[in-house]
């Protein structure tokens, strides 16, 4: 028996994104980002989360969390976050970094209801 599965509409509510920001991310040690703020202005750039010489293993993720919080504070509330879900990485280190950044991003967004 073939039961059709209804497709889910994963787009954010239009009213929510019209008055709030949308953030797009390319996760990695050097994270690419683009932000459409609540007033329609689009800005983009990169942010480096490369650990320093004397940093502990979790400092990269703490800096990423602080960067997200500051971006949210300065740009107005973020209503939606879009990012690519990578299925395969060439190296083990890249996979671990991506997994840590994605876990940090999803927990940060869940805490804020994004």
Locate each region found by the language model:
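Phosphate- and other anionic-substrate recognition elements at nucleic-acid/protein interfaces
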Residues: 1-114
């Amino acid at each position: 028996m073939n039961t059709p599965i209804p497709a889910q509409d994963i787009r954010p509510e239009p009213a929510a994104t019209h008055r709030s920001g949308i953030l797009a991310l390319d996760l990695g040690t050097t994270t690419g980002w683009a932000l459409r703020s609540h007033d329609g202005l689009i800005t983009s750039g990169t942010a480096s989360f490369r650990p320093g010489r004397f940093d502990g293993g979790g400092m990269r993720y703490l800096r990423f969390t602080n960067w997200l919080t500051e971006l949210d504070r300065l740009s107005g509330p973020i209503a939606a976050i879009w990012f690519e879900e990578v299925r395969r990485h060439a190296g083990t280190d890249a996979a671990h970094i991506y997994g840590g950044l994605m876990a940090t991003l999803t927990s940060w967004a869940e805490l804020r209801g994004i």
